[in-house]
Regions:
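Hydrophobic ligand-binding cavity/cleft-lining segments
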Residues: 1-45
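Ser/Thr- (and often Asn-) enriched beta-sheet segments in non-cytosolic proteins
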Residues: 19-21, 55-57, 78
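Generic non-transmembrane alpha-helical segments
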Residues: 28, 32, 115-120
Length: 121
């Protein structure tokens, strides 16, 4: 499976951002996020899970990029999530085309955090 670029493209636009804290060690959090979002062999999505940078990136379609960062601290880790438009042309249409993903993103992030807490805390 092709890797997603580690660096966010210069023309990219952040559409939504979320964060939450989990009282668990960073490595199991990272591993769980990486496992959940790995599209598997043969997927058309680009995917990178970089444990040295604590980042998981899934990029697919012409506009969509999801970034997950695990930021360790003394009491666990903060999970940061960004939905990013990487559309190279028609950049304004990315928000419109992705409106369903953007509308459901808060609830999806909350489900992820609830699940991670149940699994790891």
């Amino acid at each position: 499976m092709p890797e997603a670029p580690r660096e966010r493209p210069a023309h990219a636009v952040i559409l939504r951002e979320f964060s939450a804290h989990i009282r668990a060690r960073p490595k199991p959090i990272f591993d769980s996020i990486a496992r959940r979002f790995d599209p598997g062999e043969g997927a058309r999505s680009l995917y990178t899970a970089d444990s040295s940078a604590w980042v998981v990136i899934v990029q697919g379609g012409w506009w969509y990029r999801a970034e997950y960062r695990v930021i360790p601290d003394d009491e666990g880790a903060t999970i940061e999530h960004a939905l990013v438009s990487v559309a190279e042309t028609a950049r304004r249409i990315g928000r419109w085309s992705g409106r369903k993903a953007l509308d459901t993103a808060p609830a999806e992030f909350e489900r992820l955090i609830t699940s991670l807490r149940a699994e790891l805390e």
